[in-house]
C-alpha cells in the first residue's frame, strides 16, 4: 500500500509565487520517483479536487520544445490550480513510457515525416506504454477517491476508473498550437482520440 513518504512546502509557477507542497511516496508498484504537488488553495478534503496526471516531458516541460504541448499544458494547470486549488501527479513516464533516449530517436523519425505514434511503433513500442496504476495509488495514499480530472486523454480516464477512482468531471486543457507541433496535436486527436479542439 502506498503512503506519503515526505511533504515539503515550496513555491511554484513562472514567478515562483504560488504556494504548494511537494510530496514523495513509498510503497508504489515500481521504483519510479513520482511526486504529487498539492496547491495550498486546494482543500483535499473537498469531495472532488481538481487533479492532473502529468507525465514527465523534459523537452517540453523544461526546454519548451516546439514539438509538443506538454509544457504549456503543465503551465496552464499550475496557473489554474494556483487560483482554485488542485493536485498535480507528476509521473516519471517520459515519452509516453518509452524513455528519454527513445523519445529522441522518435523525434528523429518524426523529422523524416512519421507522426508521434508511427515513430514509436517503428522503434518497436506501442502507442502509449504509460501505466496509471501508481497515480491511483498516490491518490489513495492522499485519501482522495473522487476527482475532477484535467485531461484530454481518454486512456487516463479509463485507467483511473479501472483502479477505483471516481471521476465526477473531466476538465479539458486548451489547444496549445505553435509552429512545430501541429502534426503532433493532429495525431493525438486522430490516433490517440484525445478530446482536443484544433
Curated annotation (Swiss-Prot):
Pathway: Cofactor biosynthesis; riboflavin biosynthesis; 5-amino-6-(D-ribitylamino)uracil from GTP: step 1/4
Keywords attached to this entry: GTP-binding, Hydrolase, Metal-binding, Nucleotide-binding, Riboflavin biosynthesis, Zinc
Residues binding Zn(2+): 57, 68, 70
GO BP of this protein: riboflavin biosynthetic process
EC number: 3.5.4.25
A Pfam family that the UniProt record links to this protein: GTP_cyclohydro2
Binding site for GTP: 52-56, 73, 94-96, 116, 151, 156
Sample GO molecular function, one term: GTP binding
Superkingdom as given in the UniProt entry: Bacteria
Cofactor: Zn(2+)
Top-level enzyme category: hydrolase
Any Gene Ontology CC annotation: cytosol
Active site: 128, 130
Cofactor binding description: Binds 1 zinc ion per subunit.
Classification via CDD domains: GTP_cyclohydro2
Catalytic activity: GTP + 4 H2O = 2,5-diamino-6-hydroxy-4-(5-phosphoribosylamino)-pyrimidine + formate + 2 phosphate + 3 H(+)
Database matches in NCBIfam families: PRK00393.1
Similarity comment text for this entry: Belongs to the GTP cyclohydrolase II family.
Purpose: Catalyzes the conversion of GTP to 2,5-diamino-6-ribosylamino-4(3H)-pyrimidinone 5'-phosphate (DARP), formate and pyrophosphate.
Name of the featured protein: GTP cyclohydrolase-2
Amino acid at each position: 500500500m502506498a503512503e506519503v513518504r515526505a511533504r515539503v512546502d515550496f513555491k511554484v509557477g513562472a514567478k515562483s509565487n504560488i504556494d504548494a507542497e511537494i510530496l514523495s511516496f513509498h510503497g508504489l508498484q515500481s521504483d519510479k520517483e513520482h511526486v504529487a504537488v498539492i496547491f495550498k488553495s486546494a482543500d483535499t478534503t473537498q469531495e472532488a479536487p481538481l487533479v492532473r496526471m502529468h507525465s514527465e516531458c523534459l523537452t517540453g516541460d523544461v526546454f519548451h520544445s516546439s514539438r509538443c504541448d506538454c509544457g504549456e499544458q503543465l503551465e496552464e494547470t499550475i496557473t489554474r490550480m494556483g487560483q482554485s486549488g488542485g493536485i498535480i501527479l507528476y509521473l516519471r513516464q517520459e515519452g509516453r513510457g518509452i524513455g528519454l533516449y527513445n523519445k529522441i530517436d522518435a523525434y528523429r523519425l518524426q523529422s523524416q515525416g512519421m507522426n508521434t505514434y508511427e515513430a514509436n511503433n517503428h522503434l518497436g513500442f506501442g502507442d502509449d506504454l504509460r501505466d496509471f496504476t501508481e497515480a491511483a495509488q498516490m491518490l489513495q495514499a492522499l485519501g482522495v477517491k473522487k476527482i475532477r480530472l484535467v485531461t484530454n486523454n481518454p486512456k487516463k480516464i479509463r485507467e483511473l476508473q479501472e483502479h477505483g477512482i471516481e471521476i465526477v468531471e473531466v476538465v479539458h486543457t486548451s489547444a496549445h498550437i505553435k509552429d512545430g507541433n501541429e502534426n503532433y496535436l493532429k495525431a493525438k486527436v486522430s490516433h490517440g482520440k484525445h478530446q482536443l479542439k484544433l
